């Protein structure tokens, strides 16, 4: 498979060209086989503490649900997130959104009673499409 081939090639390049060290720039990381922009962003933010806002399908889905991006592309979502949030918060916020999504706003089994962010600020058309026109009753307070 391509993934294992990419990892094999990547490990040889790291040993041969970088003395076994992981490069510390986006450009060098993205030039490696099997490393795209999201992976490079994760390595830079979590490995080296460099501000980055990695966007995968989960982050993209949540920011779209919360009306923080137009949902056109992962690239646009990253630009929107970087514009909306302070750079100093990007690394931590990225993880917080992932953990929130796993716990309260999964792709499948989405429950507005648990997903209080989407229930309050979510994209109304998406909520109506997913839960019906009376979706607001799902989280109405007693």
Language-model features, listed with the residues they occupy:
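Catalytic cores of DNA base-excision repair glycosylases
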Residues: 1-141
């Amino acid at each position: 498979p391509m993934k294992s081939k990419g990892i094999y090639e990547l490990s040889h390049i790291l040993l041969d060209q970088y003395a076994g060290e992981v490069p510390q720039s986006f450009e060098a990381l993205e030039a490696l086989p099997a490393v795209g922009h999201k992976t490079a962003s994760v390595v830079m933010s979590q490995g080296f503490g460099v501000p980055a806002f990695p966007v995968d399908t989960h982050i993209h889905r949540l920011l779209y649900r919360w009306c923080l991006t137009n949902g056109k592309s992962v690239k646009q979502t990253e630009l929107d997130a970087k514009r909306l949030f302070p750079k100093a918060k990007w690394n931590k916020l990225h993880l917080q959104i992932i953990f929130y999504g796993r716990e309260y706003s999964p792709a499948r089994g989405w429950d507005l009673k648990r997903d209080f962010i989407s229930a309050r600020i979510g994209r109304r058309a998406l909520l109506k499409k997913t839960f019906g026109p009376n979706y607001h009753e799902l989280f109405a307070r007693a």
